[in-house]
C-alpha cells in the first residue's frame, strides 16, 4: 500500500497473527487505543494480545526526533519541507496535547486515573501528553489515512 512507502524498516510481512492495522487510522477513538495498549481485554474480551502497561507509564524521549526526521528526509527521500522540520517541536507538542485531551474527554475513568496519579506523584508525575502511548496512538491514527483517492469520471457517472 502506498501510504507505507516511507516506513523504515518495512513493517508489513506476510505472516498474520493479529488484525491488519493498515487501515486503522480514525476507526476508533484515542481512549480506546489507550485502554487497548494498557490491557487489550478491556476493549476486546478474547484478545490474545499482550498488555503494554509501560507504554502508558513511560515518558517519551524526543531528544533524537529531529535527527530521525532529517535522516528520513536526507537518506530515504521522505518529502519533509524545511518548514516542517523547523516547526517539529511545536507540531509534536500540539499533536500530543490534542491526543491527551481527547483521551480524557472520551473516557471519564481514564481522566480520574490521570488526576489521581497527578495528585499522588506530585513533581514526579508525567503529563499524559508526554507518555510513549500517545506517540503510538498518533501513529496508529495515521495508518491508512495518507492515501487520498480521486473520483474517476466514467461513462456511468
Where are these regions (language model features)?
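Periplasmic c-type cytochrome electron-transfer domains
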Residues: 1-157
Amino acid at each position: 500500500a502506498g501510504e507505507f512507502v516511507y516506513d523504515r524498516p518495512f513493517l508489513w510481512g506476510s505472516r498474520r497473527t493479529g488484525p491488519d492495522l493498515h487501515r486503522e487510522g480514525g476507526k476508533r477513538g484515542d481512549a480506546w487505543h489507550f485502554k487497548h495498549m494498557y490491557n487489550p481485554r478491556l476493549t476486546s474480551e478474547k484478545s490474545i494480545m499482550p498488555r503494554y502497561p509501560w507504554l502508558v507509564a513511560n515518558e517519551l524521549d524526543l531528544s533524537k526526533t529531529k535527527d530521525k526526521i532529517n535522516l528520513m528526509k536526507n537518506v530515504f527521500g521522505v518529502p519533509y519541507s524545511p518548514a516542517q522540520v523547523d516547526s517539529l517541536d511545536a507540531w509534536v507538542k500540539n499533536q500530543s496535547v490534542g491526543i491527551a485531551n481527547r483521551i480524557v474527554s472520551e473516557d471519564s475513568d481514564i481522566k480520574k486515573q490521570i488526576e489521581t496519579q497527578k495528585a499522588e506523584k506530585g513533581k514526579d508525575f508525567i503529563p499524559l501528553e508526554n507518555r510513549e502511548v500517545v506517540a503510538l496512538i498518533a501513529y496508529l491514527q495515521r495508518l491508512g489515512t495518507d492515501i487520498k483517492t480521486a473520483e474517476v469520471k466514467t461513462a456511468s457517472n
